[in-house]
């Protein structure tokens, strides 16, 4: 675990490679899960505005869900989350002609039709934020069925999670925080690399010592054999 200003972060965030590959995952993070995306109370008004403006683009099932249960629900631990239809997809999901699930809010944002991109919890995924003793604790939520395509792409292209999520992290915490965060990640990676090299050298040195001892022992045995 490491700390950047007022946030705690799990070490795997520094090492993880991640870059969405929506052509493969088909927007799975928008349609799979036991609950809807977490939202803050400060986001409620803009989400209601988005729904009012975009509801005609959404499925009939999504609109029915909102009529019956509301756009935003409260979980058992009193946290707010977006409503989902029975199949698990967010009520704001819409599909492309190729079957990719996309966010209606984000789509409208990119087209210049809405002035807000999407909930910060969606923007930051696969990072999840929890409150811990007055601090924010950020974890990397790796779910193979959702994240494997993104991890495969990132490994091939050499993209770190910390770099891929630059925009939402700055949106959440600001430029100065992000600069410190990147520096901390680079330091952690360097330390791990140096430790790995040291461990490898020690292992090689140990193997050489063992081999030398074994050779000397064999010589000793040969020298003490009785002549015939």
Indicate where each model-derived feature is located.
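Short loop/turn segments that flank or connect secondary-structure elements
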Residues: 1-228
């Amino acid at each position: 675990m490491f700390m950047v200003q007022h946030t705690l972060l799990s070490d795997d965030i520094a090492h993880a490679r991640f870059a969405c590959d929506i052509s493969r995952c088909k927007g799975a993070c928008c349609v799979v899960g036991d609950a809807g995306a977490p939202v803050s109370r400060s986001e409620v008004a803009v989400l209601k505005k988005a729904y009012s403006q975009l509801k005609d683009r959404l499925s009939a099932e999504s609109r029915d869900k909102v009529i019956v249960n509301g756009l935003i629900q409260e979980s058992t631990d009193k946290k707010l989350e977006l409503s989902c239809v029975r199949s698990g997809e967010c009520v704001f999901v819409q599909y492309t002609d190729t079957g990719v699930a996309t966010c209606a809010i984000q789509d409208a944002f990119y087209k210049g039709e809405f002035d807000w991109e999407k909930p910060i919890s969606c923007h930051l995924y696969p990072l999840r934020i929890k409150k811990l003793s007055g601090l924010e604790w950020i974890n990397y939520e790796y779910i193979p069925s959702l994240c494997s395509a993104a991890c495969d792409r990132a490994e091939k292209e050499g993209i770190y999670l910390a770099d891929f999520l630059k925009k939402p992290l700055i949106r959440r915490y600001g430029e100065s925080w992000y600069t410190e965060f990147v520096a901390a990640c680079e330091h952690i990676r360097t330390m791990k690399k140096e430790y790995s090299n040291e461990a490898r050298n020690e292992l090689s040195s140990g193997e050489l010592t063992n081999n030398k001892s074994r050779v000397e022992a064999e010589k000793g045995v040969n020298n003490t054999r009785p002549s015939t």
